[in-house]
């Protein structure tokens, strides 16, 4: 750094001192600036200042209306610094237009070039000047260590000759100390302090402008860093907006709100504390449903104590009613031990007679006897309380029964595969009962439960075992369903007993009649006598003069014919028609048995290529055109059959035999295989 006195940047302060002379301004010669020279008590320059002190080619007086911010920016050591912390030339603070400033050129320069040294010291002076700009006490701004001798540059007394507005004074004096008597450090320090002191001499009007403009700068508590030796401090995230978007002037309310916003502490969102029993809530979850159990307990306990039921020392929890009938209720229950669902049948027989009570107990005995079969509902636990008159049975839980399934599909065309599958499962269930010499005597769609896609027989309330020496059972009453009741169950076919009580004779054929009524409903959508009233049905069922109608086309319920031949019906095949007619024979001796129904062609349909050929003329060699194809009736072995098949395939490839003849030969081969002993 070259040894020189501090530069003079404020001509208004320069001319206010009467001690100013040409010798005192000799320090300007050290600048060695060819563009700057002294002439007629004024400074002339080919450049102009950005603070309004020099415009054009003449250095003019700075008006008292200039703001302290403008004079601060005009200082050569702060020229390249943005007061918001940005060192660019695009700062909005350089474009302050006041009445004392009128730009005459497109570019502006300072009188004194920016020194290359003491940069860090200038930063301290600038920071101090910005932070203490609004102070009204000049005495408090002077440091105590400053030399207060009259010859000192930093505290030289300024005397003003004339008044502002009357033109420039004729002469001004400024007393300077001898540069040789002061060290470089002292001169630099005093120069900075002098610039700092001069920047504070502003009018009251400019005080308000500077305070309003520079107050947001108080958010930055760290001094400006421009030296490469000192790293730049980190900014608070809230200061980024003000750093990149400096504002010169704004309303006082905006200033106050901005100050409150930056001074407000940052609130970090914390999830509210939740107790252990409080359920977790989320907007994406379904609506709240009252929990079935109390989660705070180790063992699930229902909300209502009356929902707990104990059967055979096993606890269950009621979930809802499945069905009801007469004096019985069926519930869906839950077992906490294995987390499975069951069905609970509760029967109240407090007002029932002994015959009814014995029938309920007989059902438990039959279920235990038939337990383990896949076609019979499983009984897990049961108990009878004669004191309370209550019977409880825990059984296998199903999805629905056959009655609901048929009602759901009654308006749709029948599906023969659907009928064939469930008809076979019903026959197998009844076969299990008959093999144990038991007659169910109350078969109906509601007594077949659908469990995991398979039908199972339930409700043995009126079932009774058959004696070993008889084929029928005798009951003193029958409480089955009328639409599925056999004719013999409605006819007094037995003599009076010694006690005068009429007996009803029932056997296995009565269950076959009931099965025939169920099959009829599966095909046509209703039972054979369901369209009649009860009195009419009771009279029509045993009456042989009343013919049961078997349509050849099965129509869905409530089918409407839009045009001729457009009904959505399904043709009933001859095998299905034969099964229904053979099951609904009024003479029970003519009805098919369960084993015969299981091997009926309806359940064992032959492929189309194995069905008997229609009687039509076929061109076969050695026969007339009106003759039927030759049927092979001789018994053959398996090897011979294999040779015939191979020969037939070979001939068919050469198109020597037609398809009808090959089918006929294959049918005869299969027929002969059936006749061969196993």
Swiss-Prot record:
Active site positions, chain numbering: 442
Cellular component, GO, one term: kinetochore
Record's compositionally biased regions (Polar residues): 41-66, 114-125
Region span, Disordered: 39-93, 114-209
Catalytic activity, EC: 2.7.12.1
Alphabetical GO biological process terms: cell division; chromosome segregation; meiosis I; meiotic centromeric cohesion protection in anaphase I; meiotic spindle assembly checkpoint signaling; mitotic spindle assembly checkpoint signaling; protein localization to kinetochore
Residues binding ATP, per UniProt: 322-330, 345
UniProt-listed SMART domains: S_TKc (SM00220)
Description of the deletion phenotype: Leads to chromosome segregation defects. Sensitive to thiabendazole (TBZ).
A GO term for molecular function: protein serine/threonine/tyrosine kinase activity
Annotated Pfam families: Pkinase
Gene3D superfamilies per record: Phosphorylase Kinase, domain 1, Transferase(Phosphotransferase) domain 1
Purpose of the protein: Involved in mitotic spindle assembly checkpoint signaling, a process that delays anaphase until chromosomes are bioriented on the spindle, and in the repair of incorrect mitotic kinetochore-spindle microtubule attachments. Phosphorylates spc7/knl1 on MELT motifs; phosphorylation is required for recruitment of the BUB1-BUB3 complex to kinetochores.
Annotated family: Belongs to the protein kinase superfamily. Ser/Thr protein kinase family.
Protein name: Serine/threonine-protein kinase mph1
Species the sequence originates in: Schizosaccharomyces pombe (strain 972 / ATCC 24843)
Organism lineage string: Eukaryota, Fungi, Dikarya, Ascomycota, Taphrinomycotina
């Amino acid at each position: 750094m070259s040894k020189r006195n501090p530069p003079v940047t404020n001509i208004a302060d320069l001319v206010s001192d009467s001690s100013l002379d040409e010798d005192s301004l000799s320090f300007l010669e050290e600048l060695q600036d060819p563009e700057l020279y002294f002439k007629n008590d004024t400074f002339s320059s080919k450049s102009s200042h950005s603070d309004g002190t020099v415009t054009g080619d003449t250095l003019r007086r700075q008006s008292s209306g200039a703001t302290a911010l403008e004079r601060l920016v005009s200082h050569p050591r702060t020229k390249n610094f943005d007061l918001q912390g940005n060192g660019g030339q695009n700062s909005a603070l350089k474009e302050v237009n006041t009445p004392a400033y009128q730009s005459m050129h497109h570019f502006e320069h300072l009188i004194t070039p920016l020194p290359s040294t003491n940069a860090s010291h200038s930063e301290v002076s600038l920071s101090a000047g910005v932070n203490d700009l609004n102070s009204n006490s000049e005495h408090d701004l002077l440091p105590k260590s400053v030399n207060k001798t009259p010859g000192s540059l930093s505290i030289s007394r300024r005397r003003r000759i004339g008044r502002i507005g009357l033109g420039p004074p004729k002469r001004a004096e400024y007393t300077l100390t001898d540069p040789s008597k002061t060290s470089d450090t002292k001169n630099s320090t005093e120069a900075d302090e002098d610039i700092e002191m001069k920047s504070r001499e502003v009018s009251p009007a400019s005080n308000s402008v500077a305070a309003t403009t520079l107050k947001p700068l108080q958010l930055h508590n760290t001094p400006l860093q421009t030296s490469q030796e000192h790293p730049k401090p980190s900014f608070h995230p809230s200061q980024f907006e003000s750093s990149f978007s400096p504002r010169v002037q704004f309303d006082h309310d905006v200033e106050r709100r901005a100050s409150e916003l930056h001074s407000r502490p940052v609130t970090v969102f914390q999830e509210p504390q939740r107790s252990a029993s409080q359920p977790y809530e989320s907007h994406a979850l379904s609506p709240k449903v009252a929990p079935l159990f109390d989660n705070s307990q180790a063992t699930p306990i229902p909300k209502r104590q009356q929902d707990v039921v104990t059967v055979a020392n096993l606890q269950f929890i009621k979930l809802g009613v499945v069905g009801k009938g007469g004096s019985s209720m069926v519930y869906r229950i839950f077992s906490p031990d294995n987390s499975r669902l069951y069905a609970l049948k509760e029967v109240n027989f407090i007002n029932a007679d002994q015959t009814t009570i014995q029938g309920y107990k007989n059902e438990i005995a039959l279920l235990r006897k038939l337990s383990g079969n896949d076609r019979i509902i499983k009984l897990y636990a049961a108990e009878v309380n004669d004191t309370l008159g209550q019977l409880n049975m825990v059984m296998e839980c199903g999805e629905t029964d056959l009655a609901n399934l048929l009602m759901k599909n009654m308006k749709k065309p029948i599906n023969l595969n659907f009928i064939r599958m469930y008809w076979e499962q019903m026959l197998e269930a009844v076969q299990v009962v008959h093999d144990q010499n038991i007659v169910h005597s109350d078969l109906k769609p509601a007594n077949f439960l659908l469990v995991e896609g398979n039908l199972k027989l339930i409700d043995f309330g009126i079932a009774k075992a058959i004696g070993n020496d008889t084929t029928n059972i005798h009951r003193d009453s029958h409480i089955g369903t009328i639409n599925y009741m056999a004719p013999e169950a409605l006819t007094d076919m037995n003599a009076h007993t010694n006690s005068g009580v009429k007996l009803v004779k029932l056997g296995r054929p009565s269950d076959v009649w009931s099965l025939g009524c169920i099959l009829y409903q599966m095909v046509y959508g209703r039972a054979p006598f369901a369209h009649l009233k009860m009195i009419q049905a009771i009279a029509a069922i045993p009456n042989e003069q009343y013919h049961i109608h078997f349509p050849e086309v099965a129509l869905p319920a409530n089918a409407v014919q839009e045009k001729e031949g457009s009904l959505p019906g399904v043709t009933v095949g001859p095998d299905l028609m034969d099964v229904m007619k053979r099951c609904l024979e009024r003479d029970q001796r003519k009805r098919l048995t369960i084993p015969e129904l299981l091997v009926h062609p309806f359940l064992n349909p032959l492929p189309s290529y194995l069905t008997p050929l229609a009687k039509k003329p076929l061109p076969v060699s050695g026969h007339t055109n009106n003759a039927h194809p030759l049927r092979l009736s001789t018994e053959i072995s398996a090897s011979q059959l294999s040779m015939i098949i191979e020969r037939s395939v070979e001939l068919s490839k050469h198109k020597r035999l037609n398809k009808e003849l090959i089918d006929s030969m294959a049918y005869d081969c299969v027929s002969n295989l059936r006749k061969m002993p196993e």
